[in-house]
Amino acid sequence: MSVKIRNIDLGDFPLLLAPMEDVSDPPFRALCKRHGADLMYTEFISSEGLIRDAAKSVQKLDIYEYERPIGIQIFGSEIESMRQTTEIVERTNPDIIDINYGCPVKKVACKGAGAGILQDIPKMVSMTQEIVKATKLPVTVKTRLGWDENTKYVVEVAERLQDVGIEAISIHGRTRKQMYKGDADWTLIAAVKNNPRMRIPVFGNGDISSPEKAVEYKNTYGV
């Protein structure tokens, strides 16, 4: 069954290029597109940087026709700044706007951005709702299982984000506390996918180190 984000048809087994700081720049995206990426995202872009018109942030808005479909990923800790950033990003005409609720690095999370917002789910939901309202483009989310072992609320969180209008969710199978240690827990990603209330595409992320591993996880977890 073909996977769609609104009118964007990604095929039966879509492969997404995850947004990675200092990695998923235009040359790297071109390489991935050539080798079959079905959907790509830019490096994440700071809302504060875009509003200040900082050169490094503005440069990351550069996208090219051959990259489509492509999403621009944004991050930030303030709802109003993220709303303004959404309006700026929409003017560059990407196919999707993606929200980063998953970056675990201290300089991002300690400010309440990225995975930091997993400590305040009501704010996460409110921010998402304002972003959805601010654009006509599809909005997607990248996140983690939770802040730590005791807050793995991703099944509920995914439902709430769907209810305020996101059109797909990508889940990294670790908590923020884990960073990139241990194994990604794909059973929880599968629980989101198999939740009968979920109507939007659910994508898994974490430990996919080869084409064979991607097929294995697809067959095992259905994600």
Segments the model singles out, each with a brief description of its role:
Residues 1-223:
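Flavin-dependent oxidoreductase catalytic cores
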